[in-house]
Amino acid sequence: MGYKDRIFNNEQGDILLDSIAQQNAILRVIASDKMTALTSDFKEIQRIVKSGNASTIFNIGDQINVPWRDVSGNQDYVMPFDIVHFGDVTLKDGTTVPGMWLQAHYCTPFDIQFSNAQAFYYAKTELPAGTYYITLTKDWGSNAKKGKSYQFTLSKPVPAGGQLRGFVRMPDAAPSTWKVYSHKDNKSVDPIETIDVTEGTSGTKLGDMPYDTAIDTSLTYPLNNMQRTAYGDNRWANSAYEQWLNSKAAAGAWWLPRDEYDVPPSQLSGKAGFMSGFGDDFLSVIQPVKVKTAKNTTAFDGSFDETYDTFFLPSLEQIYAQTQIAGEGDYWEYWKHALGRTTPNGWYDSNRNDAYKTYAINAKTSAQHVRLRSAYRGYANHTWHVNSGGYVNNYHAYWSYRCAPACVIC
């Protein structure tokens, strides 16, 4: 046989190299004595994932136990992560690499707001002291009525860059309980003043408050819409949850406003960033990956945001639930198998499935509501979640729920 006859072509060489890498991965597992030993060696797991052999060594449903500390609560936990999917990911630099997708088996020990109720007014220039009113544009719930106007009197000016907040829970709270809070900027927690609201049209009209559409920034007094003012914003890329999950900062330091109408989440001062609870050994094997999430079709155009998140909430699509739009990620085999279905699970109580129940890491017999990142596309303020009863539902971004976050070893 001649020299040239013994040379592998490129395809044969690639096959051989893949085979050698797979054999080496298997040998390392054998050498590690036990799978339990391997699943605590994060760097070795990462080497296997990078070699493209994770699905040969691991099974969907295998668990990796990771120490996590609730820094603010001074409480240590072991957080089991289920292997839910094998699939390529895109990194910030645009490269595509193999990934092993993990999701927390239990949910977090406390709640976080997806989004606080947003400000209804942003001061492009100083708003002088005086009486002002706004007019609602749609009947909503028992208390918000189309054409009704509500007035309030500022005793102090609102500086340029400041906000007016208020009308929180307007469809469900009696108008007699409504308040307006003036703030110096979109980061402040304590108001300049708290003002009573009464029905009336005295003073200067700030404008007609739209129901669910985009803010018209060309107006002299641009008003947020009723939905986001009452119950928050359902856009994952702007959410408090996205910031909390991806921060190692201390309590009070993990959130920044994403737009002029954003408001600090209620948990900002009381909880440290989620990533602060992990050791560097685990954080070194996960990194930000591209996450696609559809925007709503009322205040936005329904297109997709692309964020790069180390930790993220699952989408409807990823937990094998019925979707409103495809493109928020491949379904995870873990959920298809757990649900025992060959088609995606439907929504609401009539489609409950006990496999969806997620229990608290600090109360492992107590099922909890857990957040998803998918927006309910027909509203500006509703996001999807998995109800504690085991069914997929949607509700206001304002409410604080727990989560079972995901990440990718890559």
Which residues does each PLM region occupy?
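Collagenous Gly-X-Y triple-helix signature in extracellular proteins
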Residues: 25-410
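Short, low-complexity N-terminal tether/leader segments at secretion or assembly junctions of large
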Residues: 1-25
